[in-house]
From Swiss-Prot:
It comes from Bacillus cereus (strain ATCC 14579 / DSM 31 / CCUG 7414 / JCM 2152 / NBRC 15305 / NCIMB 9373 / NCTC 2599 / NRRL B-3711). Belongs to the UPF0736 family. Pfam families: DUF3603 (PF12227). The lineage of its organism: Bacteria, Bacillati, Bacillota, Bacilli, Bacillales. InterPro entries: UPF0736 (IPR020909). It comes from the Bacteria. This is UPF0736 protein BC_1176.
Amino acid sequence: MLYLHDVWVNWFEGEENGYNVCHFYEWRKDDTIELLDQVPLLKVDATLYHYIENELLELPQKMLKTYIIRLIFVKIMNVCSKSIALLLQNGKGIIAIDTIGYNVPIRKSRLIPRQEQMVYEMVENVQAEKYEFQVEETEKEHHILSPSPFIMNGLTRKERQLKQLLFMALDQLHTTKNTAEIRYWFTEWDPSAYGMVQHMEFEDIWAKLYDEAKTGWSDKHEQLCERLVKGQPFFEKLWEMENEQKVN
């Protein structure tokens, strides 16, 4: 069994989407960084890696019985060494997990670059372990509170957090079913649409607002988010945490 020693991790808890498990360059000074003395290292195939990185589902039973609760998984495109070399060029495919006593990867972390390189070197000539596990036949369903990676692609950690906050506020707005209010907010988003939305129903306006807001991130998105969360203590607190200033 391979082991990596003195491993620095920055745990992200309860994340079902890999894009929220931040890479080292997005770690912050106020994150809680932990040093693990010794961690078993395991290479798995791409399917299992993706399952672990992007789900909060049970790990294969054989894996749980064979290894202790902390593991590092290395993604490969397939079992041949060429694919590993390609991944080395991409610099992707390593994740640390901690089940904290459960059967699911509750906590996940990336590694620091130096230790990522060490992992790639350690597993270069190692065959991937095979484990049986149940994969859902249907594709994972993303929704407004669990956006697809495509929607989050290319955003910084702060932008991802604010975009998820915007979606939370839009989701709450959807529960009101208040046509006058959604017309107001769409006009805030797009003043030129004032006349158009006066002849639209609530669901149509909300769907159009969400459809437009889910693309990219800009000052326009940030302004809408700031205005939507104003006066809502929980949302305002999340806003302040990302901006280090109070919502005016």
